[in-house]
């Protein structure tokens, strides 16, 4: 590992439970882990690289029963790739994010020998969210139907999921009466978006971007809090890991320069009105 050859201490199974900005600059952090209990470290520069988390069924307001058999796409990946378990046999996938599309293909292949199937992918928007290559390679090549402007409106089942109700929506994403359909299934996979993970930074109060849900940064990946950098999916959700690596390299270099007192100082390069700058989505 890189840390073994660079004299870097690496703490695993360790949680940051508190971050305090020091009056003279830098940060005090409180950690906890099974080996050391609670302990403290100080630093001159801090990089937020905490990634993002998946939205759950409670965050997309699906009504009905609360049976087992409802998983996020990341949970399904963990069961199959790391634990060797199949989460179900007949699947409905809500959302057309890249992870959901990849899981549609994977579930089709994994359940082919036991008669399983992916009943369809349902997307509330009028356009798919994932990359075109994943639409082609994961859905079209395997004959998996994609239903746009359609969402899962209710769950049905006692104990285990038995089926879902899907409903078409209008341009304002309101359910269209009379379009409800019942789809039998035992597993619902949610691929309904990712949210940058920044809750631990609340005590530092960096200015957050309402669109990306991550901190506002300058070209050096430094936030409005001096010495605090952000990169990867903690900054904003990236489609490609190449962009994650690029932002991480910039943040790491600039954080190191700040520690050496040789880097750019202050936040003068931060736009004064970043919300007025158009972005390509």
Spans of model-derived segments:
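A conserved FAD-binding loop/helix module that cradles the flavin
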Residues: 231-277
């Amino acid at each position: 590992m890189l840390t073994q050859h660079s004299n870097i201490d690496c703490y695993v199974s360790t949680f940051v439970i508190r971050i305090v900005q020091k009056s003279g600059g830098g940060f005090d952090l409180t950690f906890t882990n099974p080996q050391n209990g609670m302990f403290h470290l100080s630093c001159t520069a801090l990089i937020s690289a905490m990634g993002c988390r998946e939205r759950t069924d409670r965050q997309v307001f699906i009504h009905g029963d609360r049976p087992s058999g409802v998983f996020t796409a990341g949970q399904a990946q963990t069961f199959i790739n790391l634990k060797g378990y199949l989460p179900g046999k007949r699947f409905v996938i809500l959302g057309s994010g890249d992870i959901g599309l990849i899981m549609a293909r994977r579930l089709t292949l994994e359940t082919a020998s036991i008669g399983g199937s992916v009943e369809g992918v349902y997307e509330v928007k009028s356009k798919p969210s994932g990359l075109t290559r994943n639409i082609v390679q994961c859905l079209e090549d395997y004959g998996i139907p994609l239903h746009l402007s359609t969402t899962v409106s209710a769950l049905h089942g006692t104990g285990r999921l038995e089926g879902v109700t899907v409903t078409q929506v209008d341009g304002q994403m309101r359910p269209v009466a009379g379009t409800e359909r019942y789809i039998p299934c035992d597993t619902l996979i949610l691929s309904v978006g990712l949210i940058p993970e920044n809750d631990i930074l609340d005590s530092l109060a960096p200015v957050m971007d309402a669109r990306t849900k991550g901190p506002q940064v300058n070209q050096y990946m430094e936030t409005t809090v001096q010495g605090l950098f952000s990169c990867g999916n903690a900054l904003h959700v990236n489609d490609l890991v190449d962009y994650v690596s690029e932002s991480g390299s910039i943040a790491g270099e600039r954080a190191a320069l700040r520690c050496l007192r040789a880097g750019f100082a202050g936040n003068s390069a931060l736009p004064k009105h970043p919300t007025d700058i158009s972005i390509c989505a």
